[in-house]
Amino acid sequence: MEAASTWALLLALLLLLLLLSLTLFRTPARGYLPPGPTPLPLLGNLLQLRPGALYSGLLRLSKKYGPVFTVYLGPWRRVVVLVGHDAVREALGGQAEEFSGRGTLATLDKTFDGHGVFFANGERWKQLRKFTLLALRDLGMGKREGEELIQAEVQSLVEAFQKTEGRPFNPSMLLAQATSNVVCSLVFGIRLPYDDKEFQAVIQAASGTLLGISSPWGQAYEMFSWLLQPLPGPHTQLQHHLGTLAAFTIQQVQKHQGRFQTSGPARDVVDAFLLKMAQEKQDPGTEFTEKNLLMTVTYLLFAGTMTIGATIRYALLLLLRYPQVQQRVREELIQELGPGRAPSLSDRVRLPYTDAVLHEAQRLLALVPMGMPHTITRTTCFRGYTLPKGTEVFPLIGSILHDPAVFQNPGEFHPGRFLDEDGRLRKHEAFLPYSLGKRVCLGEGLARAELWLFFTSILQAFSLETPCPPGDLSLKPAISGLFNIPPDFQLRVWPTGDQSR
C-alpha cells in the first residue's frame, strides 16, 4: 500500500513538472533571446548536449546558430552561450558591468551559497574582491616579496624532484603541493612539508573536487541538480571532498582567531580579514563575516592548488612529447642565465622562446574551456537581442584560445605563433586564459608569476624524459568539462650536467 502511494506521488509530481515545463516553454519570453534548439519538456536540450561532451556539443550548436545562441540545461536553466573571440570580448569587455554577475555552479552552490569572493554578487562581491586584491598586494603579490616567496617554494620542489634519482614518478601531487604551499603562505601564513599526511589529504580533496565538477556526472548535475540532489550518487563524494577542504580552512582560521590581536599587522589574508571584521563589527550590514571569510579562503585554497599545478603539469607533458622544444628551451636558459643563477620574473624579456612555450601550453590546454558562468546584472541589449536581468551566460574561453580566425591550426602545438619576426614575444589580444572584464581571475598576477618561476626553474635544473616513446604520450585531456584536466604521466628527471647516465 505504501509503495503504491509512493509511486502515485511520483507520477503526480512528474505530471506537474511536465505541465509546468510546457507552460514555461509556451511563454513568449524566448522572443527577445538569441536563437537556439527547441527544448523538450523536462529534458531541455539534453538530446543536443550529452553530459560528458557538453563543451563540444555547444561548439557544434554554434555552427548552426552562430556565435550567440540559447540553450536549456535541463527544463528550466536557460543559458546564453558566447562563442569565439569577438562575441566574448564584446560582452565581457565591451559591456563589462552588465555581464559581471556570477552564474550558477550547481555542484558547488550548496557549499558556497553565494558567499566568498568567487560566488558572491552585487555589493558583497565588489567589497570582497576589492579587499582580497588589496590584501594580496599588501602581502607581496606583484612585488619582490611575493617573488621571493615563490622562489623559496621552487627550491623545495627542485629538491623533491632530485630525490627521485632518475626513477619514474607521477609529478601531479608534488606540483599541486608546491603551488598550494604558495597559497597557504599568503592566505594562512604557513608552509606544509610534502610528506605531511593532512596536507596530502587536502590535495587529494582538491583534486577530487576538480574531477567531480568536470566529470560527465558533474555535467549531468549542472543540468538536473533538482532531480539528482536528493538521490545517492557521486555528489556525496564531492561533498566529502569539499568538507575536507572546509575543515582544513576552519582549522586554520580558528588558529588565527586564538592568537588574533587587533593592534598587530596582518601576516596573511586571514589576519587581514579578521582585522576588517573587527573594524566593522558594529555594522549590521557588513559583508566581512565569518561565512564570507571561510568561503573566500576555501576558494583561494582550491583554485590556487589545482589550476596552476595542472597547467605546469601540461607544459611538462608537452616538453616530453616534443623533445626538440625542450632542448631549445634548455639551451635558451643556459645561454641567458647559466647553470647557477635562479630565474626571476625580470628574465622574461631575455627568454622569449621559453615564454612563448608557456603561452602556447596555456592556450592549447584551455584549462577552463567553458569559462565560468556569468549572469546579466541588468536587462541589456546585445547584438540585437534583449537579455533580461538574471540571464545566465557561458563565455566559452576555450573557443577563444582555439579560435581558427585568430590562431592558425589551433589544435597544433606551435610556440612560434607567439614570436614575431625578430624572435620577440608577440602579444595576442585573444590570449585570454584568465578571462577578461570585471570577473577576470583575481589571482592572474600570482598565477603568471608561479607558472614562470616553477617552469623555468625545473627546466634549468633538469632534463626531462619519459619512460615510454614520446609519440605514445596523449595530449588529450583526461576529462573535459568545466575544466580540462591533463592526463597523468610518468616523468624522469636528470640533473643538468649529470654525467652518470
Swiss-Prot record:
Its cofactor is heme. It catalyses: all-trans-retinoate + reduced [NADPH--hemoprotein reductase] + O2 = all-trans-5,6-epoxyretinoate + oxidized [NADPH--hemoprotein reductase] + H2O + H(+); all-trans-retinoate + reduced [NADPH--hemoprotein reductase] + O2 = all-trans-4-hydroxyretinoate + oxidized [NADPH--hemoprotein reductase] + H2O + H(+); (5S)-hydroperoxy-(6E,8Z,11Z,14Z)-eicosatetraenoate = 5-oxo-(6E,8Z,11Z,14Z)-eicosatetraenoate + H2O; (12S)-hydroperoxy-(5Z,8Z,10E,14Z)-eicosatetraenoate = 12-oxo-(5Z,8Z,10E,14Z)-eicosatetraenoate + H2O. Heme binds at residue 441. GO terms for cellular component: endoplasmic reticulum membrane. InterPro entries: Cyt_P450, Cyt_P450_E_grp-I, Cyt_P450_E_grp-I_CYP2A-like, Cyt_P450_sf, Cytochrome_P450_fam2. It is a peripheral membrane protein. GO terms for molecular function: 12-hydroxyheptadecatrienoic acid synthase activity; heme binding; hydroperoxy icosatetraenoate dehydratase activity; iron ion binding; oxidoreductase activity, acting on paired donors, with incorporation or reduction of molecular oxygen, reduced flavin or flavoprotein as one donor, and incorporation of one atom of oxygen; thromboxane-A synthase activity. It is found in: Endoplasmic reticulum membrane; Microsome membrane. One of its GO terms (biological process) is retinoic acid metabolic process. Its EC number is 1.14.14.-, 4.2.1.152, 5.3.99.5. Pathway: Lipid metabolism; fatty acid metabolism. It holds the Pfam family p450. Its main location: endoplasmic reticulum. Keywords: Endoplasmic reticulum, Fatty acid metabolism, Heme, Iron, Isomerase, Lipid metabolism, Lyase, Membrane, Metal-binding, Microsome, Monooxygenase, Oxidoreductase. A cytochrome P450 monooxygenase involved in the metabolism of retinoids and eicosanoids. In epidermis, may contribute to the oxidative metabolism of all-trans-retinoic acid. For this activity, uses molecular oxygen inserting one oxygen atom into a substrate, and reducing the second into a water molecule, with two electrons provided by NADPH via cytochrome P450 reductase (NADPH--hemoprotein reductase). Additionally, displays peroxidase and isomerase activities toward various oxygenated eicosanoids such as prostaglandin H2 (PGH2) and hydroperoxyeicosatetraenoates (HPETEs). Belongs to the cytochrome P450 family. PANTHER family: CYTOCHROME P450 2S1, CYTOCHROME P450 508A4-RELATED. This is Cytochrome P450 2S1. It comes from Mus musculus (Mouse). The lineage of its organism: Eukaryota, Metazoa, Chordata, Craniata, Vertebrata. The gene is Cyp2s1.
